[in-house]
């Protein structure tokens, strides 16, 4: 498993702004994961859940939902960054989310990230991390997004 970069202070986080945090392990996106996401969200569009119809469609197969790809950030994040010495961390939001390329069923994905901002907030710190999710063999990212987290001491 990928080993995260461990930060033990706000000063360490601030000093790392702009640095690339490495790569996660590869994750295969299979039809079961796509179907479960469709069930959880109610998005059963045929390009995601109907392999027969999708085979004749624009992608030649089913593809993962863009939001499924985005939802992998909580899985990928801990493989890249860990903040120690805090009582809790919470998701605060996302910025600049885009899905430049589709994720065909069976694709293997991994993420890389860099810290783009660290700001003091009441009781803690806000950290912005720019994620890029790529598909093995792909020429464009499948998801780019800024994830905003807050850590409270």
Name what the model sees in each region.
Residues 22, 26-28, 98, 104, ...:
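Generic structural detector for well-ordered beta-strands
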Residues 35-38, 70-74:
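Predominant activation on well-ordered alpha-helical scaffold segments within soluble catalytic domains
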Residues 1-15, 102-153:
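HotDog/MaoC-like acyl-thioester-processing domains
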Residues 66-68, 142:
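An amphipathic alpha-helix/helix-turn recognition signal
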Residues 19, 23-25, 33, 43, ...:
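A generic structural signal for short beta-strands and their flanking turns/coil linkers
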């Amino acid at each position: 498993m990928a080993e995260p970069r461990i930060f033990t202070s706000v000063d360490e986080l601030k000093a790392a702004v702009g640095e690339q945090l490495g790569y996660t392990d590869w994750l295969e996106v299979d039809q079961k994961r796509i179907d479960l996401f469709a069930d959880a969200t109610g998005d059963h569009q045929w390009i995601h859940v109907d392999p027969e119809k999708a085979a004749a469609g624009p992608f030649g197969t089913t593809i993962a939902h863009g939001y499924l790809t985005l939802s992998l950030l909580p899985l990928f994040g801990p493989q890249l960054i860990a903040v120690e010495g805090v009582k809790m961390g919470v998701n605060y939001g996302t910025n600049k989310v885009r899905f430049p390329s589709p994720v065909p069923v069976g694709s293997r994905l991994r993420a890389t990230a860099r810290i783009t901002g660290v700001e003091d907030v009441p009781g803690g710190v806000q950290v912005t991390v720019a994620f890029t999710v790529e598909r093995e063999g792909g020429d464009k990212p499948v998801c780019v997004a800024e994830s905003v987290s807050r850590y409270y001491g």
